[in-house]
C-alpha cells in the first residue's frame, strides 16, 4: 500500500492545541442566553459541522431541562439559529488567537512536500471560518491544496465520508485506501473509516485530551500517561488504524507504510 494523499482536520489536529477555540465559543454563546454547558457536553460531538453540533447540544436532556426551566418552553429552530449566529461571531473573533500550528506540523509539511504526497483538509468549520484560518496557516507555511466544508457536500459532514471523498477527488486520488485521514476526534476516525481511508488519531493536543499545552505540561508524568491512555482507548474503540502521540511521529509512519515491498528474484 502507498499513501498518496493525507487529509487533515484543523482545530486540535494541525492548529489550536487542545481544540480550545470552538469550546470557548460554544460556552460563551450558550452563556449569553443563560445556559451553562460543560466541556464534556461539547466535546462528545466535536468533529461535526458547527451548525449540526449546536443542534446536538440543544438535544441533550440536561440542556433541554435547563432551557425549559429558564424559558418555560423547549428550544426551537429559531433558538438554534440565534445561538449559532452568536457562536459564529464569537469564534470568528477568536480564531486568529488560536491559529498557531501544533508541534511537529512544520516537519510534516516539509516531509509531505519532499515525498510528493498531496495534502488537504476536511473541517467542521464553515467557509467563512475557514477563510480566516487559511491565511494564518499560510503565514506559517501550511497551505493545504484543498479544503472541504460541509457546504460543498450538500450539508453532509462527519462522520459521513462525503467531505473526505470530495477532498480525494479534488486531489485526483481515486483509490480511497491510498488516502490517510488524520484527526483528533472520534468523528474524524469514523469519517476515515466510512471512506475506506487509513484513519489516524493524534493524542497530544487533541479534542479528546481537551487540555491546552500549558495545562498538559503542568501534569505529572503519571497524569500525562493516564490522559494519553484515555485518548488511545477512545481511538481504539472508534476503530483507528493508527494512533500517534504527536504529529512528529507521522513521517516515520508514512515511511513504514510506503516502504517498497521486497520481492524475491
Curated annotation (Swiss-Prot):
A biological process term (GO) from this entry: organic phosphonate catabolic process
Matches recorded under Pfam families: Hydrolase
Keyword DNA-binding: no
One GO cellular component term noted in the UniProt record for this chain: cytosol
EC number from the UniProt entry: 3.11.1.1
Record-listed Mg(2+) binding positions: 9, 11, 184
Coiled-coil segments: none
Needed cofactors: Mg(2+)
Catalytic EC class: hydrolase
NCBIfam families per record: phosphonatase (TIGR01422)
Subunit structure: Homodimer.
Homology family: Belongs to the HAD-like hydrolase superfamily. PhnX family.
Function: Involved in phosphonate degradation.
The protein, known as: Phosphonoacetaldehyde hydrolase
Gene name of the record: phnX
Amino acid at each position: 500500500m502507498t499513501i498518496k494523499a493525507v487529509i487533515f482536520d484543523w482545530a486540535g489536529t494541525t492548529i489550536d492545541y487542545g481544540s480550545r477555540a470552538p469550546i470557548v465559543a460554544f460556552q460563551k454563546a450558550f452563556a449569553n442566553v443563560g445556559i451553562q454547558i460543560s466541556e464534556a457536553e461539547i466535546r462528545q460531538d466535536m468533529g461535526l459541522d458547527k451548525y449540526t453540533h449546536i443542534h446536538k447540544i440543544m438535544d441533550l436532556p440536561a440542556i433541554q431541562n435547563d432551557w425549559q426551566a429558564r424559558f418555560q418552553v423547549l428550544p426551537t429552530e429559531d433558538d438554534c439559529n440565534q445561538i449559532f449566529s452568536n457562536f459564529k461571531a464569537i469564534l470568528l473573533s477568536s480564531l486568529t488567537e488560536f491559529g498557531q500550528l501544533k508541534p511537529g506540523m512544520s516537519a510534516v509539511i516539509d516531509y509531505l512536500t519532499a515525498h510528493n504526497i498531496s495534502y488537504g483538509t476536511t473541517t467542521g468549520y464553515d467557509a467563512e471560518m475557514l477563510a480566516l484560518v487559511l491565511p494564518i496557516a499560510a503565514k506559517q507555511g501550511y497551505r493545504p491544496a484543498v479544503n472541504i466544508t460541509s457546504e460543498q457536500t450538500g450539508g453532509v459532514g462527519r462522520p459521513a465520508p462525503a467531505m473526505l471523498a470530495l477532498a480525494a477527488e479534488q486531489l485526483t486520488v481515486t483509490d480511497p485506501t491510498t488516502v490517510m485521514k488524520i484527526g483528533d476526534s472520534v468523528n474524524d476516525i469514523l469519517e476515515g473509516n466510512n471512506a475506506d481511508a487509513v484513519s489516524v488519531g493524534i493524542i497530544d493536543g487533541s479534542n479528546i485530551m481537551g487540555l491546552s499545552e500549558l495545562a498538559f505540561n503542568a501534569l505529572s508524568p503519571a497524569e500525562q500517561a493516564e490522559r494519553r491512555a484515555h485518548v488511545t482507548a477512545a481511538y481504539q474503540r472508534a476503530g483507528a488504524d493508527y494512533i500517534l502521540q504527536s504529529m512528529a511521529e507521522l513521517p516515520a509512519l508514512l515511511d513504514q507504510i510506503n516502504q517498497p515491498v521486497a520481492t524475491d528474484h
